[in-house]
Amino acid sequence: MNKEIIYDREMNIQRCYSTEYQGMKVKYIDHMGSDLSVVNSAYASFGKMEHEYNPDKHDRLIQYLSRGMSEADFEKLADNLAYKTTNAKDVAKALWQFRNTPTHYSPFTHTCITLQCTVPIAIHAQLVKHTVGFNINTVSRRYVSTTPELFIPEFRSKPTGNIKQGSGDVHEQAHYWQVWYKRQAEASIRTYVDMVDAGIAPEQARFVLPQGVMTEFVWTGNVASFARMFNQRTDSHSQKEIQDLAHMVGEIIEPLYPVSWNALTGN
């Protein structure tokens, strides 16, 4: 993964400005708020406001907001599960209770991050399923007729067993299929260009483009919504390309809200 690191004078930290991996790109555009914003949003219930971040006090508050329980209660639960609870039903009950413990996510939503992303159309189609707390504006080929870039995937085998989704290791003939894919996809792109040059409307010509062409979009959300996406898309059951993209997003967001990001993602 290629990363562009900048020094942020306002935050007095070095942070990731953009990431690129296998043709996919994520770039920082803007953000609002900090871990202190999360703290003050929580304190609003008591009519209070802090002017400086106090790690000794505020780290614990943010962890409590994300878990729905104090650090002491969390450690007690972990200790019981690890050393004291042996009955399978008791373990299942404790895990169910932890999973369904009411959390306090609203303070995290008083933040805002805007990113610019370049991904294959097939990956974009998965990302737009994340709707809660997000807004997306995508380059439209109704209006843009530039020659699209092509994503070259790593072709992997079907998963073993009865699993219907996902993929396994790199296919033994991956290089052959990459060559075939590139030849067919580039032919489709040339056809698209020829159709536009011949006077076909871009919104009609785009139907010949394959799922592997790149698209660009502006993506805005809060730290809680991005963390939810990160947790779901870094799971081993997700497609590898979207796992990679989620990690790229995390590289940019984590330095902006380090305590909140850790509390929400465990990173």
Predicted regions and their residues:
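Family-specific signature for flavin-dependent thymidylate synthase
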Residues: M1-N267
